[in-house]
Regions:
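Intrinsically disordered, low-complexity Ser/Thr/Pro/Gly-rich regulatory segments
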Residues: 1-214
Length: 214
């Protein structure tokens, strides 16, 4: 479904709310095999909740949380802040942990195996959610990278798969228990967003057909 065709989308005028709506509903730039469904992410209230916030923030700018604008020009951090806000305030969601570190047993247990981006409850189901939000490009769509040439799409894809697999490790389950979260019945899911840029403005067939391009 193309959520941008929803008539309510075009009633959203506040820049931050439109950014949040894009983060919630955009198609994935690549598939991980465990995408979080947009309907699950939006919940029952969906765009109507966004519309209510839009009207409130337009009429009273002081109601917009300051932390949602401080990282606007750092794409990854901005996306993290927006999603954390949604998990904290949407009525169908509950944020249990964010950026939860997972430590290994080497060097006295101080080595970091990774972080779990979010542990959140959505519609009564517990999720370990990993977020990736990237702008990548190349002339042909092959070997895509960000502004830093070492920040390749392939590298990010591999890292994301490792992060999604963290939940199954004993170390991650111990970290969850230490945080007061029972690791049973938690599902790993991804939210992948972004744009792929090529000289032709289109993406190769290996990308999802609805992925955003430019």
């Amino acid at each position: 479904m193309n959520y941008a065709q929803d008539a309510l989308w075009w009633r959203l005028t506040h820049p931050t709310i439109r950014d949040l709506a894009s983060l919630l509903t955009a198609p994935p730039l690549w598939h991980t095999g465990c995408e979080l469904p947009v309907r699950e992410l939006l919940g029952e209230h969906g765009f109507r909740l966004l519309l209510a916030w839009d009207e409130q923030w337009q009429s009273d700018p002081q109601r917009q949380p300051e932390n949602l604008t401080r990282n606007r020009y750092a794409l990854g951090k901005y996306a993290e802040d927006l999603l954390a806000y949604w998990f904290t305030h949407a009525p169908h969601a509950k944020l249990l942990a964010a950026n939860l570190p997972v430590y290994g047993n080497e060097a006295g247990g101080n080595s970091t195996l990774g972080e779990m981006d979010y542990i959140a409850e959505l519609n009564g189901t517990l999720y370990h959610i990993e977020l990736a939000c990237k702008y990548h490009g190349s002339a042909t769509g092959e070997h895509m990278a960000g502004l830093n040439p070492r920040d390749t799409l392939a590298r990010k894809q591999r890292k994301l798969q490792r992060q999604l697999a963290l939940l199954a490790t004993p170390e991650a389950q111990a970290a969850l228990r230490q945080h007061g979260i029972a690791p049973d019945n938690i599902r790993s899911a991804s939210i992948v967003r972004g744009i792929g840029f090529t000289a032709a403005g289109t993406l190769p067939p290996a990308f999802p057909p609805q992925a955003w391009s430019g």
